Amino acid sequence: MDLRVGQRPPVEPPPEPTLLALQRPQRLHHHLFLAGLQQQRSVEPMRLSMDTPMPELQVGPQEQELRQLLHKDKSKRSAVASSVVKQKLAEVILKKQQAALERTVHPNSPGIPYRTLEPLETEGATRSMLSSFLPPVPSLPSDPPEHFPLRKTVSEPNLKLRYKPKKSLERRKNPLLRKESAPPSLRRRPAETLGDSSPSSSSTPASGCSSPNDSEHGPNPILGSEALLGQRLRLQETSVAPFALPTVSLLPAITLGLPAPARADSDRRTHPTLGPRGPILGSPHTPLFLPHGLEPEAGGTLPSRLQPILLLDPSGSHAPLLTVPGLGPLPFHFAQSLMTTERLSGSGLHWPLSRTRSEPLPPSATAPPPPGPMQPRLEQLKTHVQVIKRSAKPSEKPRLRQIPSAEDLETDGGGPGQVVDDGLEHRELGHGQPEARGPAPLQQHPQVLLWEQQRLAGRLPRGSTGDTVLLPLAQGGHRPLSRAQSSPAAPASLSAPEPASQARVLSSSETPARTLPFTTGLIYDSVMLKHQCSCGDNSRHPEHAGRIQSIWSRLQERGLRSQCECLRGRKASLEELQSVHSERHVLLYGTNPLSRLKLDNGKLAGLLAQRMFVMLPCGGVGVDTDTIWNELHSSNAARWAAGSVTDLAFKVASRELKNGFAVVRPPGHHADHSTAMGFCFFNSVAIACRQLQQQSKASKILIVDWDVHHGNGTQQTFYQDPSVLYISLHRHDDGNFFPGSGAVDEVGAGSGEGFNVNVAWAGGLDPPMGDPEYLAAFRIVVMPIAREFSPDLVLVSAGFDAAEGHPAPLGGYHVSAKCFGYMTQQLMNLAGGAVVLALEGGHDLTAICDASEACVAALLGNRVDPLSEEGWKQKPNLNAIRSLEAVIRVHSKYWGCMQRLASCPDSWVPRVPGADKEEVEAVTALASLSVGILAEDRPSEQLVEEEEPMNL
């Protein structure tokens, strides 16, 4: 497909005054030369008219020379140009120099076209001479009336359409191709593949076009002419991305003030400005955004919508990527699940089934049982498996890797996907590959081994077999297996034991038939790891996939995962998302190019045109300067986080599980009704709470948010709801800390007035808040109000960015991991212990791993390390006392416990001897922080726990 567009070259800026002064003598010589040449041309016709025999004498030798050149033998031909060609080239060069000089003298004059279609002034005589020797060329209807002065040698693609067979022109359209009425979208094409000469790139199905404009730039045509490509794309606004990419965000930045990486200045990429709707062209390490107008035509081996571009970049910091039409790169391991037989069956292709990725074919309905001689081998296999179990160390650190999920193949929401997580990987390593380690004769009977493996898997204890549930499919109406990694369909009813290929991993929402142990539930999935910036550099982004990966690994190292019920997540449906967010917000951030094919094209076209992204300094794309966006994976990860928290909350509310911890990302408590900000797209905790309300699973719900940033999205969602009590402990600094909301006087509205409690810490980091301040807030404000509210379920936005180890822009507080564990224990005294923690913020890997470990240990009821003596005995700082006093004063008219504290201020802060006059007056006015009065409101069985020394 020829994509050349007649476009004028960019006008060069006027030279500097110093250069003009140096060029004046040269211009004068040029003007004199041109004047003499024009005078000579004007005198030449007069000489020809006065002396007619002279042209004949002059033409004679030229005519004879031309005849000799035309009739020269092939063996005598050379590359030396004739005098006529030299003269013609000299005239063309002279004319170009004259045009360049005129543009320099008059910079504001309109530029000349890229190629002059009119004949040159001096070619009339030459054409008359050559017309008698050169045969006439038949003209085509599409040719201009005059031939080009200099025809390019590589011009075959210009004539490609003329000789295209009529049969290919009349071929019907492939049903798998994108509909013409579908909204326009983008295709990300990695720049490395354009210039790569490796075999992997040379065999790419989508090889691009071979027009002269592309081939004239060498081996890397697109990267060598970024400006020209940008001008071409600007002329095709109907097919460019339906969103603009501003460079400045109007939303507040959560990372404002963070120091840039050391190498930020050295490798920062520069992007030419191409207008408000222009594409973004990056460096050789930045993917290019190409519209569908530049995609190869259909009719190849694969439809243009399904032609991948495989990129193997060993020098990059990220994993190998697979780029498909869209904006985001795919990890290489997802390529196998994307190119499934089911998706390519409509194109008429028959790909052979790879035996390395598929499993053995299931037996027929009349398959006989294993023969008798195989019994000794089965016993030997059983012994070998037991030896492997005994040799495995529970404290050994597992190897974390991203396992491909079939969830990405689900383009509509709601149903749980066939996703494999790290827990399943552990199971497969222990029970899916014993034949590779056993004796050689056993490898000849894979079917028998699969039967034995499944029989052994049913006998192994729950904690040692992994974190997911493998159940054979029931006979009858079962859900069909995903075709991503399974072999061809098997008969519905089998008399023989079902092999492992007929076992599927059930998500947490599909396991109600199995009785879950009444313990702590953990939820995690590798789908959420794919939400990454296209730059591949995690050091530039505080919120990255390594956060949940590190937490999941820490829980495995400490043996906590084996004590919990590890569940599978699911993707939240669009209807569930719309219970909190607007339809526009859900369609913008809850769909990807694959899932949009099943939605209303007319509605999507208008919404996508309103979507705005920003260009990040790293070269990626984001909703704002903090929140990165990956067109293929961000929507799936955000929906998976929301669905996982919702599913875990339902299991705890129905008492299938005692409590739970959701290791999810991206976070959600900053996402409000129609805005994504602060790393958040969908408010997972708010969605779970709303779903519990709509399905009458809980009448009163308490949401505690101890993230150092205020949960503005959660507060906005339930600001007028009296059935949801929202309590937030956050750094406020009088509105000068992100996101700026969460003041003490924000207490709710309407019927929900008083059900919004903000413990807004003030005073900055002089000194920073720590364990004494958070313990005082929990004992003075959080727990008394929560007991008076008496919730049925407790949801916790468990952000750990208040933990020690975070820089000042991301928190700067010094809360210990033991304090987070203690606060979790306190919340378990509410709602019968029905507590669900969902990971929110926290970006220091060591801090969030320690805090998560302490919280999970508290949920399990294990012995938590006691707080330090300093944390118990040290009194809160003056800024914290003032903040707590403000909360008591504001909420004294809504809660009885706060009213009693406000009426007796002298009873909860003792006098501090030896303090200066100002501090003594403040402390005397604010009263004591003793917990003696609080003991009157607590049940008798809790007095023993509260009698710990609290000399604050």
Curated annotation (Swiss-Prot):
The active site is at 670. Residues 360-374 have a biased composition (Pro residues). InterPro entries: HDAC4/5/7/9, HDAC_PDAC, His_deacetylse, His_deacetylse_dom, His_deacetylse_dom_sf, Ureohydrolase_dom_sf. Residues 130-224, 261-283, 349-377, 389-441, 460-510 are annotated as: Disordered. The gene is HDAC7. It catalyses: N(6)-acetyl-L-lysyl-[histone] + H2O = L-lysyl-[histone] + acetate; N(6)-acetyl-L-lysyl-[protein] + H2O = L-lysyl-[protein] + acetate. Responsible for the deacetylation of lysine residues on the N-terminal part of the core histones (H2A, H2B, H3 and H4). Histone deacetylation gives a tag for epigenetic repression and plays an important role in transcriptional regulation, cell cycle progression and developmental events. Histone deacetylases act via the formation of large multiprotein complexes. Involved in muscle maturation by repressing transcription of myocyte enhancer factors such as MEF2A, MEF2B and MEF2C. During muscle differentiation, it shuttles into the cytoplasm, allowing the expression of myocyte enhancer factors. Residues 218-546 are annotated as: Transcription repression 2. The record marks 843 as: Contributes to catalysis. Changing residue 843 to A: Enhanced deacetylase activity. A motif (Nuclear export signal) lies at residues 917-952. Residues 512-865 are annotated as: Histone deacetylase. Residues 167-181 have a biased composition (Basic and acidic residues). Keywords: Chromatin regulator, Cytoplasm, Hydrolase, Metal-binding, Nucleus, Phosphoprotein, Repeat, Repressor, Transcription, Transcription regulation, Zinc. It holds the Pfam family Hist_deacetyl. The modification Phosphoserine is found at residues 109, 155, 181, 283, 358, 364, 405, 486-487, 507, 595. The keyword Nucleus applies. Residues 877-952 are annotated as: Interaction with SIN3A. Residues 1-268 are annotated as: Transcription repression 1. Changing residue 843 to F: Enhanced deacetylase activity. The keyword NADP does not apply. It comes from Homo sapiens. Interacts with HDAC1, HDAC2, HDAC3, HDAC4, HDAC5, NCOR1, NCOR2, SIN3A, SIN3B, RBBP4, RBBP7, MTA1L1, SAP30 and MBD3. Interacts with KAT5 and EDNRA. Interacts with the 14-3-3 protein YWHAE, MEF2A, MEF2B and MEF2C. Interacts with ZMYND15. Interacts with KDM5B. Interacts with PML. Interacts with FOXP3. Interacts with RARA. Residues 197-212, 482-503 have a biased composition (Low complexity). The modification Phosphothreonine is found at residue 286. One of its GO terms (biological process) is positive regulation of cell migration involved in sprouting angiogenesis. This is Histone deacetylase 7. Its EC number is 3.5.1.98, 3.5.1.-.
